[in-house]
Amino acid sequence: MIDLKSIWNDKRKITYFFLANVCFLISGLSSLIVGVWLYSSKNNFIELTPTSYSALSAAGLCVFTGVTIFIIVAVGYLGVSWSNKSLLYSYIGFVILLILVHGIARITGSLHKEEAKENLRKSMLHNINTTAVVTKIGREIKLSLTWDHLQRELQCCGVDNYTDWHYSVHWPNNLYTPDSCCDPQHFDAENGTENCGKLPDEQSLLYQKGCFPKFSDWLYHHIILVNWVTSILFVVEILLLILSLVVLRVLKNSRHKTRRSHRERDPETTSENMRLNSMDRIADARLETDTVEDGMSINSR
């Protein structure tokens, strides 16, 4: 027969709380690593994506979560170790905040998947005719270099196909494409692919598939990883919220027991209580006497 009291006593509750926080800390470290990896792996193409579908959005969420978890775990550990209810209330508030953030992020990512893909496609089509962008720190980036890197790495051309480059602002009167659209397997190492995009009659030498399907799938597979991380964190945070409320009740009960034991051990308090109790008994006796006398007087009348 399993003794539930030995498994779920006050000491075990606090131990479970600490163990859950260790798991929470590990998941926070994992989230931080994923965020840094997402930023470094997608940073080369970040200028081609809209803000709503930006790699930095997912990376920023993971980094924010990781750093916040470190702070939350520290607050929770100190709150329980010092039996400080204010710190524990702060811990509960932070956990609820993360639950809301991850819940909203998970639902939004599931509901607006197709809309985000269409926004990505429109942004890529717009950027084909944009020569450069200026970052928030004032640095100018030539989009032609970003497109060249994207097309060579993903072996694609344009958004839907190579015709997206025709009559672009780079060559408004010609059916040219960037040299990065040329498939290297059709060229020898000696001649290379220089000016191959200016051969409109040799379109078979170009990558035939557009970059949008590959780029969106590439981003989406990485975002799936983020969704898994947020889902795991969401479950852990719900568990921590329940355990933190249980521990808060344990601390309150412990404080009440401590105060009661101090009162019982304090002789002055005990004698004062006895004096007050005796005075209460005297007052009760007087009240009973007065009640009896009043009753007798009424009967005599």
From Swiss-Prot:
Keywords of the record: Cell membrane, Cytoplasmic vesicle, Glycoprotein, Membrane, Transmembrane, Transmembrane helix
Gene Ontology annotations of biological process type: positive regulation of BMP signaling pathway; positive regulation of multicellular organism growth; positive regulation of Notch signaling pathway; regulation of mesodermal cell fate specification
Cytoplasmic topological domain: 1-16, 81-86, 244-301
Disruption phenotype: RNAi-mediated knockdown in a sma-9 (cc604) mutant background restores the production of the 2 M lineage-derived coelomocytes.
Ranges annotated as spanning the membrane: 17-37, 60-80, 87-107, 223-243
Record-level Gene Ontology MF annotations: identical protein binding
Entry GO CC: basolateral plasma membrane; cytoplasmic vesicle membrane; plasma membrane
One Pfam family from the record: Tetraspanin
Name of the protein in its database record: Tetraspanin-21
Organism: Caenorhabditis elegans
GN (gene name): tsp-21
